[in-house]
Amino acid sequence: MSKQCDVCGKKAQVGHHVSHSNIKTKRRFEPNLQSVRHQYPNGEVKTLSVCTRCLRSGAVVKPAVRKVA
């Protein structure tokens, strides 16, 4: 599973750890991805890796929850 949002395409960025003595070492900033079940307009349901920004903006439609009898 790649560290990339399936909706907006957001992926890891490169930056630095900066120590007290100002020594810089490489690091990665990973997006906050969540696994979410998404329902397409034709009724198909798939699991997507979605960043929290897309979740909050409503870019993903969650399927209706069925009640178990």
Curated annotation (Swiss-Prot):
Keyword Transport: no
UniProt keyword Ribonucleoprotein present: yes
MF terms in GO: structural constituent of ribosome
InterPro entries: Bacterial_rp_bL28, Ribosomal_bL28, Ribosomal_bL28/bL31-like_sf, Ribosomal_bL28_bact-type, Ribosomal_bL28_sf
GO CC annotations, alphabetized: ribonucleoprotein complex; ribosome
Gene3D superfamilies given in the database record: Ribosomal protein L28/L24 (2.30.170.40)
Keywords from the named record: Ribonucleoprotein, Ribosomal protein
GO process terms (BP): translation
Family statement: Belongs to the bacterial ribosomal protein bL28 family.
Name of the protein described by the UniProt record: Large ribosomal subunit protein bL28
Organism of derivation: Nitratidesulfovibrio vulgaris (strain DSM 19637 / Miyazaki F) (Desulfovibrio vulgaris)
